[in-house]
């Protein structure tokens, strides 16, 4: 395509091409390049450019400065074509055109590292420019492309090497010139060949350092006075930086990012003898003095310094004239200080693993840091956030030049805005002084969460958040500072409003899968030197569904303690047997479940009479998937997880649901409908989210919604909109992007027609079970189950009652027997009062008494209060009270069905219409389509 060159202030090496060319691209523009052929004086020259993706007006738009660099004139005709830029550059070596360009590049090395690909995407052998935020630009000349090619695509993994081009006249400096450099504590960026034979206390300076000294003075940073250090020349260069050995950094508490003045030491201190007073270990420590002394060869020691060496958990107080250690055996004498307690190091209550339990999220954070974006990582307490913080801190300490700081937001003094502002100003000053910086904000939710009941921020809180927002946004624009926040999920409206302003990326830590739990448990047991079989670890990983990382650590500690106790009591054989593991699992309660209220009912499954269809459905949906979870996981079909029990009042819906907790190996959470509703916006939805989150943590778990029609009515009928939002949230939780793995929903209602129809569709409440009035056989079974609790004189009377109680519900039958029992109790009380004769009227003759008289005589020998208590104790057993036939008939006369004919007819018509509307289309489809989904009525 022929077009003309048009100048435009693009401030980039990317170009704009006509829309006609862009339409021919089917993939992202990053995968393509523009080939521009220029013909001048019968000489053709080809250029290659990266595409910006912005269409132009029938012209080839290019930055004017970049065009002058390539000698492309405005309005010059060129031929354009789109080519597939599949060639990837692994290494690009470039050189600044002038020494001024080198100085600018050296001062802005960190910015270039992050933003080079934004302006220069397709590498060629032609000169190019990079614009800086200040408005200046740097010219570079490519020297080498590996693999060699006319053009290639730059990736984030491409290694870019900048060859220094120093000003030769400026290198000829005075002897005592001080050079300002930013320090980096020794890490993996340094080649092993440089650090292998280096002294324990030294600095690594670039090759272009003036005079390449062997010994240097260093001042600034956090040093109280000038120190002298051994110098090692390092071919690996980061402009404006130097490396410092780990031992030297530990001894003087130096961190990456501190800035120092360094100059050549013309008259360094000579060799000297030193006394090292050992601190941190008792005298019987087997730490070799010769080993410590050997590490200090060719190192400079200062009088009064505190010496700390890598891999040695002890510190030394140095005394002697400042100088270098030439002969360690002769020059160093080590003594012990028994008055100093053992140095246990930094205590951290959070469990920390040597492995990374969240590799995917760890990679996400690394990518976000590469893009210079703020990140917020959320998860419940104990899920592994602290472990991730330390993993990130260790990673960037070993692989970057970032200054790092951890801020605990929960410990900030917020008694006044002045103190709050002063604290953060100090943090921001350090981050700005030592940039590039990464600031870890722990417990961020403590800053943004509101203490008000309605979730709204107060005036002081809004002022604090506005201050933080202003400072963080300004620092992000002007400085290379990255904020990584950790905390719990933001749920309220005000929190979600503030979150995107402070953090661009939000990462939620997921629950631990079985394989991940197995890896974590293996690591924990290995770190505790426990001999446990892999079969036992796999068994524990399967049984710890919903456990957080902290739960796993605490569980292993509990298990090891139980094993130790068993070892003392029963000997060392079979310490980690399955019985011990199961016992520990049964007694252990995860952190997230310690505040949860789980229901354990005394109702047994065998106590439920009738309702065979409902009981079979509950077993199919809940018991089988839980009991045979490994088999069901291999099934790719989506299993039903919801049951709706609907029917007449008193027909056993709640009774059946209550028996689940005592029958199946699941946790049971019961929710009364109205308790989820709240007058404040967002609170009801938050309650629903918390409820499902608790259930997910406790899985396998059953959520039982009683009176479901009150919490999930048809949308559009509530003037306040509260129930509409609750229904929307329940729909999202039940059948949203995140599946309810291991969480089962059981709902009960008398009015299914009032429930929102969306909740009754497949994928939500899959099984709709009608709980009808019991028939004669079911009534007899109910009466027989209830009769086991009482003493019925004539069991055959129950058959007669079952025929006389047509229209009775399960609750009515239970009330009938309880009324009969109450009649029997009243009769017994009357008999007891008659037998309680006054003691003054009794005789002393107790000979030839009948059995009943003997009992009465023994009662009369007791005080009146004792006689009454013993009578009541004999009546406390329900089976000691005999229910006779006439009592049952008398109770039947007093009772009547709780549903009168009008209510029964109304509900019957309602259930008939509900079932016909809901199921007739499916029944018709089932007659024509084989394999259609069926639903249970």
Curated annotation (Swiss-Prot):
Belongs to the AAA ATPase family. Its EC number is 3.6.4.-. This is Peroxisomal ATPase pex1. It is a peripheral membrane protein. Pfam families: AAA (PF00004), AAA_lid_3 (PF17862), PEX-1N (PF09262). Interacts with pex6; forming the pex1-pex6 AAA ATPase complex, which is composed of a heterohexamer formed by a trimer of pex1-pex6 dimers. It is found in: Cytoplasm, Cytosol; Peroxisome membrane. PANTHER family: AAA-FAMILY ATPASE (PTHR23077), PEROXISOMAL ATPASE PEX1 (PTHR23077:SF12). One of its GO terms (molecular function) is ATP binding. The keyword Amino-acid biosynthesis does not apply. GO terms for cellular component: cytoplasm; cytosol; peroxisomal membrane. SMART domains: AAA (SM00382). The gene is pex1. Keywords: ATP-binding, Cytoplasm, Hydrolase, Membrane, Nucleotide-binding, Peroxisome, Peroxisome biogenesis, Protein transport, Repeat, Transport. It comes from Schizosaccharomyces pombe (strain 972 / ATCC 24843). It catalyses: ATP + H2O = ADP + phosphate + H(+).
